[in-house]
C-alpha cells in the first residue's frame, strides 16, 4: 500500500477549484486529478479517485505509519502526516472502504512555531521529529507513550513450535 500527503496550491485558496491538502491512497491506474490552476479535476468525476482524507490548508512534508511505535494500538495503526506551515502532526485513522480507505484526521502534535520537517520512530518506540527550514531554528523532538505498558500479543502454536526448534538448533 502506498499513501501520500498531497499539497494544495495556496494561491488557489478561495477560488472554486481550490483543493485542500489531502491524504491519498495510491492505487494502480489511479487518477487523482492533479492539474494546474482551474484545470483541476474535481474528485466527483467518475474517473478521478477521491482523497482518503481532506486535511485543509497546510504544507505537507511527509508521512509515516506508527507500526514501529510503542503507542497504543489506535496510533500503531495510524498514518502520521506532517504539516510544516501550521506546525501540526496528524494521526490519520484509516478504515477500509472497498478497494481503498477513508481516513479520519486527528491533531496529534501541535505547536507555534513547529515547522515539522521529518519524522521517524526509534528502536525505543518513540516518535522523533525535526523542525527547521527557510532560515528558522532547527530542533529535535521526542514523543513517547507514558501510559500502561502494552501487552505482547499471544503467539500462535506454529510460532511457539518454530521458536522451540530454533532454540534446540542453537543448543
Q: Can you describe what each PLM-predicted range is?
A:
Residues 1-171:
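Beta-propeller domains with acidic blade repeats across secreted/periplasmic ectodomains
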Amino acid at each position: 500500500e502506498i499513501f501520500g500527503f498531497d499539497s494544495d496550491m495556496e494561491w488557489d485558496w478561495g477560488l472554486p477549484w481550490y483543493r485542500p491538502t489531502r491524504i491519498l491512497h495510491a492505487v494502480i491506474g489511479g487518477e487523482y486529478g492533479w492539474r494546474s490552476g482551474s484545470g483541476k479535476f474535481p474528485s466527483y468525476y467518475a474517473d478521478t479517485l477521491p482523497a482518503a482524507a481532506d486535511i485543509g490548508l497546510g504544507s505537507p512534508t511527509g508521512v509515516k505509519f506508527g507500526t514501529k511505535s510503542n503507542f497504543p494500538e489506535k496510533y500503531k495503526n495510524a498514518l502520521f502526516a506532517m504539516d510544516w506551515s501550521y506546525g501540526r502532526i496528524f494521526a490519520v485513522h484509516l478504515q477500509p472502504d472497498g478497494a481503498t480507505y477513508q481516513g479520519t484526521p486527528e491533531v496529534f502534535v501541535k505547536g507555534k512555531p513547529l515547522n515539522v520537517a521529518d519524522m521517524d520512530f526509534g528502536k525505543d518506540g518513540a516518535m522523533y521529529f525535526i523542525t527547521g527550514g527557510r532560515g528558522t531554528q532547527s530542533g529535535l523532538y521526542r514523543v513517547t507513550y507514558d501510559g500502561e505498558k502494552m501487552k505482547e500479543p499471544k503467539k500462535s502454536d506454529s510460532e511457539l513450535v518454530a521458536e522451540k526448534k530454533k532454540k534446540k538448533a542453537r543448543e
